[in-house]
């Protein structure tokens, strides 16, 4: 019955193989139309994608509708019939996922979404990455530094068998490493006059990410147990503090990396190096990078993003208001999202109170990433270099007195930073140069 109905839907669409024959089609025209209609506010469904060989003129004019895709996608996974999309007759662009149905696959930490939805996600990732990051080293060459191998990723056709490889999804995804985070050399103590979380004003930035909604997102998106979600929702969990290693952090990182394929960064330096300002900056950048890698994978998932935002109204408002500042979030509803992925790094610095201007990247003869020249800047004397945060991550605005002649230039690393950057276990993959056009 399911296959008969699906075959009728695809009768005039024979240029692409049916989804049960190919788990990753090269191109699906109707799926792009459905995504655009669903996440761009078109309440009338998708644009017509076929209008020939139909007996009914109304059907030809109407085309493939959003409700058709809902029904069709759940035929491949009937057990998820009421998860994620709500009523098929609902006119709203999307509906939130009931929380009691989010945590139904706790043993394998797998989101409860249909196979068809995962196909769309993985197809979009594979299709867009080659144009965007030609200089990035492949994930294959650095698998020895990853605690989670691609072979442990869940398979599309065998969701219960987590040992099946999913190489077509994992081998094409590129992530930043610690060496690629723009360094911000600042003298003295970083003052947090307007902080977002638990930290006290004037405290050194030591790797905490106090914004609790970041962890709520990861819990909702990656099926962590409800008990873990409740703990994280109550307070900001320390991430990167060398003296605190909560099991929640390890569970979070392990679960998200297993599903998304994000490589886990290597271990921290030995205990004799875990002291001083330079180590704090290293630890902060390292863990900030880990979270940004995971979050970019979550935000890039068209099917998860709107539903999570409805479950977190505060973050929904903040992300909506940050759109003019962050081109990535403004284009997250579109298929080609990775062209602005570099804006994630400064954005998550702002979440963690790591005040810095939005960086500009350009190609250099040295083949290295750009860094800020902050040798003449101090926080206390040059407040105009710092974005003014007025109400949260979504309200960040650069001061109008930001100097027009401010240009990024290369800053040499200290001996301690060079020692960290030369350690092979500090990053999962390296980028020789970054030159996107913002």
Curated annotation (Swiss-Prot):
Keywords: Late protein, Virion. GO terms for cellular component: virion component. It comes from the Viruses. Induction: Expressed in the late phase of the viral replicative cycle. The keyword RNA-binding does not apply. It is found in: Virion. Together with the penton and the other minor capsid proteins (M1249L, p17), forms a complicated network immediately below the outer capsid shell, stabilizing the whole capsid. Plays an essential role in the formation of infectious virus particles. Especially required for the formation of the capsid vertices. During virion assembly, associates with the membrane and probably mediates the docking of the penton complex to the inner membrane, where it recruits the capsomers to form the penton core. Belongs to the asfivirus p49 structural protein family. This is Minor capsid protein p49.
